[in-house]
Regions:
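Transmembrane helix-loop boundary segments of multi-pass membrane transporters
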Residues: 50-56, 60, 111, 121-128, ...
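Extracellular loop-to-transmembrane helix junctions
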Residues: 44-148, 266-276, 445-453
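Loop-to-transmembrane helix boundary motifs in multi-pass membrane proteins
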Residues: 23, 28, 152-160, 253-274, ...
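Membrane-helix boundary/coupling elements in multi-pass transport proteins
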Residues: 45, 87, 110-128, 234, ...
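Helix-loop-helix junctions that connect adjacent transmembrane segments
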Residues: 17-22, 61, 138-159, 183-314, ...
Length: 469
């Protein structure tokens, strides 16, 4: 029993982080835009209205602040580990160095769920806006081709096709993908700027009363959670993506300097934008009217700016495209790192000689996510994402403290300030947000982790590179 425990807790020395075979071409600006591209999307364009209508009311601004603080603590921890440990794979690589192999496997398995489900879920949202845009142009798609079977259709074809299109983009190479991302980020930031400018002149602060109609936290008879803290657990999804910057560490020109900057700059920018947009949106209409698919565009329409509503719908399509692109990118790099370490089949580690991209991983995951997006409804896809992300953040915050204790001699180009205070606050706040999630999310998450442990003990523990050493 003891040898088994020792085997599962073996750690990967930081010195073992091998020289990258990936192309090092991303600057600090590229990484910051990568983060903004991943973060600004579903949250600001959809979740703001839903959380205001069903969870927090106008106090959704407080929900964004609480969720943003939890993410800020975790982001600083990500930045320290990215600068210290390196190696693509995000929280997976950091956990391998800090906690040991089995925890790294659990985190990696968890991140595969998080990123894969996120891409498929966002593709569903993208498909809805795309279908609406085609209808507005007089070319509606048949309902059978825009809804999953559970929603009365045959297949959500636009959702599947956008993932396959992004698959081709990633196969071309990461720099081309970064250029597309930069262009899309510009479009959606322009869209948000237009909304802020127009909304600022049409505020009605009487809509902020009552400010906290659902209080801080409560559980309804049907099991639904409401209140500011429940809203924070929901809008937390809006921040998912900044950690994708840390998966790009092997493709950064100066990873120790630029990856922490990319993480922190993108999160600060997006947090400020979220709070401003949430405050303005809830001042335009009564909060209970905002539970629609496109609350920002809907609000513009209600106050008489139809042209702005059309522009915002275009921005939504651009915004959700970049979210999918960056999360898809992060997913492939995590699987690449796990394959390189022997925990997943080595064939997934293969790089295309011309583009230096993991084409096999990109293709396999793209096809699987396209199938999920085409045949599984949005609500079922999105339920698992938050709890998996929060679990990874808890381990990253703990990993900072553990690695400082285990390897104090390591060079740390970036160090989280105030000692263990911020990692502790990050660990506690992310754990608290997990508690506010519904029981069904915990049950499904548990099933996924059990499946992962079966794979680990049947395959990964024997094929691990550390086992061969």
């Amino acid at each position: 029993m003891q040898p088994l425990i020792k085997t599962t807790l073996r750690t990967k020395r930081v010195a073992q982080q091998q020289d990258s075979e990936l192309k090092q071409c991303l600057s600090a600006t590229d990484l910051t835009l990568l983060g903004i591209g991943a973060i600004i999307g579903t949250g600001i364009f959809v979740l703001t209205g839903h959380a205001a209508a069903h969870q927090a009311g106008p106090a959704v601004t407080l929900s964004f602040i609480f969720a943003g603080l939890a993410c800020a603590f975790a982001a600083l921890c990500y930045a320290e580990l990215a600068a210290t440990v390196g190696g693509c794979g995000s929280a997976y690589g950091y956990s391998y160095a800090a906690f040991g192999e089995i925890i790294a496997w659990i985190v990696g398995w968890d991140l595969i769920l998080e990123y894969g489900m996120s891409v498929a879920a966002v593709a569903n949202g993208w498909a809805g806006y795309f279908s609406n845009a085609l209808s507005a142009l007089g070319h509606p798609l048949p309902d059978m081709l825009t809804h999953a079977p559970a929603k009365g259709g045959m297949v959500n074809l636009p959702a599947a096709l956008i993932i396959l299109a992004l698959m081709l983009m990633l196969i071309v190479g990461v720099k081309a993908s970064a250029r597309l991302n930069a262009g899309m980020v510009f479009i959606k930031v322009l869209t948000i700027t237009v909304f802020i400018a127009l909304a600022s002149g049409n505020m009605d602060i009487s809509h902020w009363s009552p400010f906290m109609p659902y209080g801080w936290f409560d559980t309804m008879p049907d099991g639904k959670t409401v209140g500011v803290l429940a809203g924070a657990s929901v809008v937390f999804f809006a921040y998912i993506g900044f950690d994708a910057v840390s998966t790009a560490v092997e493709e950064a020109r100066n990873p120790q300097r630029d990856v922490p900057r990319g993480i922190i700059y993108s999160l600060i920018f997006c947090t400020v934008i979220y709070i401003v947009v949430a405050a303005l949106l809830t001042s335009l209409l009564p909060y209970h009217e905002l539970g629609v698919d496109s609350p920002v565009a809907y609000a513009m329409q209600k106050i008489g700016f139809n042209w702005a509503a059309a522009l915002i719908s275009t921005g939504v399509i651009a915004g959700l495209t970049t979210v999918m692109l960056v999360l898809y990118y992060g997913l492939t790099r995590i699987i690449y790192a796990m394959s390189r370490d022997g925990l997943l089949p080595h064939s997934l580690h293969h790089l295309n000689k011309q583009t230096q991209s993991p084409v096999r991983v990109i293709t396999i995951t793209g096809v699987l996510m396209a199938v999920m997006a085409g045949f599984i409804p949005l609500d079922e896809l999105a339920e698992l994402v938050n709890i998996g992300t929060l679990a990874a953040f808890v381990l990253v915050c703990g990993g900072v403290m553990l690695l400082r204790h285990r390897a104090p001699q390591l060079p740390r180009p970036f160090v989280v300030p105030y000692g263990s205070l911020i990692p502790t606050l990050g660990l506690l706040s992310c754990a608290a947000l997990m508690i506010f999630l519904p029981a069904i999310a915990w049950m499904r998450f548990g099933v996924w982790l059990i499946l992962g442990l079966v794979v680990y003990f049947i395959y990964s523990i024997r094929h691990s590179k550390l086992n061969q050493e």
